[in-house]
Amino acid sequence: MVFSSLPVNQFDSQNWQQQGNQHQLECVTTDQNPNNYLRQLSSPPTSQVAGSSQARVNSMVERARIAKVPLPEAALNCPRCDSTNTKFCYFNNYSLTQPRHFCKTCRRYWTRGGSLRNVPVGGGFRRNKRSKSRSKSTVVVSTDNTTSTSSLTSRPSYSNPSKFHSYGQIPEFNSNLPILPPLQSLGDYNSSNTGLDFGGTQISNMISGMSSSGGILDAWRIPPSQQAQQFPFLINTTGLVQSSNALYPLLEGGVSATQTRNVKAEENDQDRGRDGDGVNNLSRNFLGNININSGRNEEYTSWGGNSSWTGFTSNNSTGHLSF
C-alpha cells in the first residue's frame, strides 16, 4: 500500500528524530526574547481593530460623541407627574435629537419631541406583589365571612330543634296554608292513650279549620234552602253531618257501634301495661278493638289486651282462620 501524498522517507524513525531536533532549534532561535512573543499574542490583527472601531461607531452613544452632541441633563421634570426623579436612558435609534428619559416615580418613559407612554413599564416589585396578594386574599375571606354570617342571620338554623316550639317563628313557613287546617289541631287526630305525645282531633274540626282558614270549600257549599230540594234522600242520614254551611260526608267503614265501648273499657288496661316507647300500645289500640261483622258471624275481640288471644270465637265450618 503506497501513499502518494506522503514521501517515503517520513516513515523512517531516524528521519522523525532529525525533524524533531530541527523544530526545537527553530523555536530557540526565534524565541530568544520571550517579551516579543507576548507582544505578538496580545496585539490583535489590524482587521480586527478596524472591525471593532466600526461597531463602536454604530452605537448611538458613540455617534452622539462623534457628532459632539451634549448629553441631556439628568434631572428633568416628568411631563406626567412633574417629578424630578428621572434619568436619561438612551437616544432615539432614528434621531440623536430625541433622547429618551424615564420617570422613576410613575414608571413611564417619554421621548423629547415624542409622545408620553401612558402604560407603566413592568409590574411592581416582588415585595409589593406579595403584600398586595395577601391583602386581597384577606379581603376576600372577610367578604365571604360577612356574606355567610348575613345568610345565616337571615335564614333560621333548622338543625336546632329548640326553635320549633311554634311554627309562626319561622319566616319561611306559614301555618295558615289554604289547603291545610290550622297546625294547632294536627295533634288531635287520634284517641288518647296511644303511647305518643299528642292527642286526637275530630274530622269536623279539621273541616271547619279548612273552611275558616283557606276558604277552598266556599265554592262547593250548598245553601240550606236548596239542600232539601236537590238532595232529599241525604237529609237525616247517619252518614252525613248537616251544618249551616254545607253537607260534609264522614268516612265510616264497617266498624260497629261497640267499638266506642271497647275503647273505653281498654283505656285502663293500656295505662297499666304502657311501655316506654308506646309502640305496643299503639298497636293494641288500633288492632285490639275492631269488630268485624260479616255474614259468617266472625268476631275478633280483645287482641293484645294482656298479650293473649282470648275471646276468639269462630263459627266457620272449615275451622281455619281467614283474614
From Swiss-Prot:
Q: Keywords for this entry?
A: DNA-binding, Metal-binding, Nucleus, Transcription, Transcription regulation, Zinc, Zinc-finger
Q: Mark out the compositionally biased spans (Basic residues).
A: 126-135
- A GO MF label: DNA-binding transcription factor activity
Q: Where does the chain cross the membrane?
A: none
Question: Which residue ranges have biased composition labelled Low complexity?
Answer: 136-159
**Keyword DNA-binding included in the entry's annotation:** yes
* Expression triggers: By auxin and salicylic acid (SA). Repressed by jasmonic acid (JA).
Q: Does the keyword Disulfide bond apply?
A: no
One Gene Ontology cellular component annotation held by this UniProt entry: nucleus
Q: Where is this region: Disordered?
A: 121-160, 304-323
Its annotated function is as follows: Transcription factor that binds specifically to a 5'-AA[AG]G-3' consensus core sequence. Enhances the DNA binding of OBF transcription factors to OCS elements.
Q: How does it assemble?
A: Interacts with OBF4.
Q: What is this protein called?
A: Dof zinc finger protein DOF3.6
**What is this protein's gene name?**
DOF3.6
